[in-house]
Every structure is written in C-alpha cells, then in structure tokens.
Regions:
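N-terminal pre-ligand scaffold of iron-sulfur
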Residues: 1-84, 102, 116-133
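Short cysteine/histidine-rich metal-coordination sites, predominantly Zn2+-binding motifs
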Residues: 83-91, 107-115
C-alpha cells in the first residue's frame, strides 16, 4: 500500500510505504517549509484519495486539523489553501459559514457551535513543518 501526500496547489506527491516513512523519518513526514507559508495563512494536503487535512500558520505557531466540518462532514475550503476568513482571524467552513478558533478548532459561530475540528499532530524543526506520529 502506498501513501500519497498531495499539496493542493503544487500537486506534489510523496509515495512510500507507511512503515518505511516511519522508519526513515523517525515517524515524521515533511509537509513544507515554515517560510513558504503565508502568515497568517493555510495550506491543504491529502493522504491517499480520502484523508484531507490542513495546516494554519499564525505567527510562529503552526496548527493542523482534519479537513472535515463537524456540521455536515464537508471540506472546509472552497478554494485550494483558503481556510481563513477574510480578516484571517478564524477558520471558515465555506459550505455553511461556521467559524472556528484557530488555536483550538472550536466552533464559535454557525451551525455546529461548540463542536471542534479534529486536530492533527505537527512539529516544526529547523524551519520544516512535519506530521508527527
């Protein structure tokens, strides 16, 4: 089985056996460089054909969430790498307008008030953003 990691805009694909990724990278998968992210801004990724997630940079913090709105199970973005409100102060679901705190993933407005986005573990080392196991 191969894992395909795809960056929405550049369509960069990383193919490898999941066990080899764990062994070769100590459980961490490189996503992108911190310097390549807009601040504040987001970037979407896909593992295989189904699992979507995104990362948000806010100052020197990087947070990640599964790209599924808890309201209807739809992806949050309406356009590649667009996950934030116009003012870039909240994560926005483009389907029904729910807004989420960047730091916690908690819905603070819209149809899923009080529910939270599913977080993913990330780490930043030497300016590299990685999925952490």
């Amino acid at each position: 089985m191969e894992t395909h990691l795809q960056n929405g805009k550049n369509k960069t694909v990383i193919k490898s056996n999941p066990k080899e990724v764990h062994q070769d990278l100590g459980g961490n998968t490189f996503l992108c460089h911190l310097k390549d992210m807009v601040n504040p801004g987001g970037k979407g990724f896909r593992v295989g054909r189904r699992e979507r997630f995104f990362i948000i940079r806010k100052d020197n913090k990087v947070l990640g969430y599964i790209n599924i709105c808890p309201h209807q199970g739809t992806p949050l973005d309406w356009k590649d790498d667009v996950f934030l409100t116009f003012k870039k102060d909240y994560i926005l679901c483009a389907t029904h307008g729910a807004v989420f705190e960047i730091e916690t993933g908690e819905c603070v407005g819209g149809p899923c008030l009080g529910r939270i986005l599913v977080p993913i573990k990330l780490k930043v080392e030497n300016g590299k953003i990685m999925l952490a196991c």
